Design a protein with these regions (language model features):
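Conserved alpha/beta-hydrolase catalytic His-Asp/Glu region
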Residues: 137-140, 158-213
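Short beta-strand/loop motif that positions the catalytic acidic residue
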Residues: 212, 218-220, 224
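Flexible "cap/lid" loop of the alpha/beta hydrolase fold
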Residues: 114-119, 123-161
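Catalytic histidine-centered segment of alpha/beta-hydrolase-like enzymes
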Residues: 250-259, 263
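Gly/Ala-rich beta-loop-alpha elbow adjacent to hydrolase catalytic centers
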Residues: 105-113
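Conserved HGGG/HGGXW glycine-rich cap/lid loop of the alpha/beta-hydrolase fold
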Residues: 22, 27-72
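Alpha/beta-hydrolase fold catalytic core
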Residues: 1-36, 57-60, 98-99, 125, ...
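Active-site loop/oxyanion-hole signature of alpha/beta-hydrolase fold enzymes
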Residues: 19-22, 27, 64-104, 264
């Protein structure tokens, strides 16, 4: 983890709390009357939100957690879904006195905010999503066939594993199967976190968007292939008070690639809360 700097130029405050059965690492920095929560994407950690924090640290108190299973935080005590992650972040906000706050979330972080914004609207004053995950991509015919083939082979190998003397060979076959059919994110995880990953990405959060009460700004790269622009447009339709800004040429990490523009837009949206 990097060294975070607070408004005095000294060492930032890096802390941990035991929440929901695991250690949650988070950083507090910045100054000002406003409170700003920054949430990273899957497979990353809070360091990837630092460029955003730097742009707001002179006007906001900023909270940047590492999600359980990421960065310096411990793993979930059992496979978690979006709801468990949302509960964890809600408790962190309450225990650190960060209610209400503004929030800027990227990718997986948007899943967490979506659940919280719909079920605990008092938590957020304003919301910014960038490359937000939460809407399931429809499977193409080819992808559907590939998924079905994977499930059949997996079931077959699991059956082999129950036969005496075949367990080791079956495990090796399953491992090769995962590497062939699993995504890069999936294959990078250990067995415990794979179960969490599957639970998280299998949930479609469309039903939550109409229940948002906070004003929401969606900032999207038009070249995003992970969470394509049509997802941002769909969220704009479903969230009652939402607007969409498109960053031309921006990928899933447009907020980093076009940091100056992203931060300018975000600052304009949040300036009344500083």
């Amino acid at each position: 983890m990097p060294v975070y700097l607070d408004d005095s130029g000294g060492a930032g405050r890096m802390m941990t709390k035991n929440i929901c059965g695991t250690e949650v690492s988070y950083t507090l920095q910045g100054s000002g009357k406003g409170k700003l929560l920054l949430l990273h994407g899957w497979g990353c950690d809070g360091r990837l939100m630092q460029s955003v924090a730097n742009a707001f640290a002179d006007r906001f108190q900023i909270l940047i957690p590492d999600f359980p299973g990421h960065g310096n935080s411990g793993k979930p005590p059992e496979p978690w879904g979006v709801q468990e992650y949302a509960d964890c972040i809600r408790i962190l906000l309450e225990e650190t006195g960060f209610v209400p706050c503004c929030v800027i979330a990227h990718s997986f972080g948007c899943r967490i905010v979506s659940v919280l914004a719909a079920t605990y609207p008092q938590l957020f004053v304003k919301i910014i999503f960038t490359g937000g995950a939460g809407i399931r991509k429809p499977l193409s015919d080819e992808a559907q066939k590939r998924t079905e083939h994977y499930k059949k082979l997996k079931g077959l190998y699991e059956s082999f594993g129950k036969i005496p003397l075949m367990h080791s060979a079956a495990e090796k076959m399953e491992d090769r199967l995962r590497k062939k059919y699993g995504s890069a994110d999936y294959n990078a995880l250990d067995e415990e976190m794979r179960k969490t990953f599957v639970k998280v990405i299998s949930q479609d959060l469309t039903e939550y968007y109409p229940h948002f009460q906070a004003s929401t700004l969606l900032i999207w790269g038009d070249a995003d292939t992970e969470t394509p622009l049509w997802m941002g447009k769909k969220m704009e339709e479903l969230i009652p008070d939402a607007g969409l800004v498109i960053l031309e040429g921006g990928s899933h990490f447009a907020y980093l690639e076009q940091a100056a523009r992203f931060n300018l837009i975000a600052n304009h949206f949040l300036k009344e809360e500083a």
